[in-house]
């Protein structure tokens, strides 16, 4: 399974330049270049942007939250290495 598709059951898709998060009645695209703050708290991943928007992604385990955290960091690094 590709890294970008690993989190689809949680409503998260990792693209080359942005993250897409879908909830019941909301769909959000967060460009990696706009992420100012990224943290893991138990099984939640918190993303805050430069404009102070905050997205909280609820995952099933802390390990999954940590894995998503690491994968987002990889995508951010790729963005700035290009």
Can you say where each PLM-predicted feature lies in the sequence?
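Negatively charged, low-complexity tracts enriched in Asp/Glu with abundant Ser/Thr
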Residues: 1-22
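Acidic, Ser/Thr- and proline-rich intrinsically disordered linker/docking segments
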Residues: 2, 7-8, 27-28, 34-82
């Amino acid at each position: 399974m590709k890294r970008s598709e690993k989190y689809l059951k949680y409503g998260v898709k990792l693209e080359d330049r942005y993250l897409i998060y879908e909830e019941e009645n909301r769909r959000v695209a967060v460009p990696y270049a706009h992420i100012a703050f990224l943290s893991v708290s138990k099984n939640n991943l918190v993303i805050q942007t430069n404009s102070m928007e905050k997205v909280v992604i609820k995952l099933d385990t802390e390990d999954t939250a940590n894995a998503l955290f690491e994968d987002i960091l990889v995508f951010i690094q790729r963005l700035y290495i290009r």
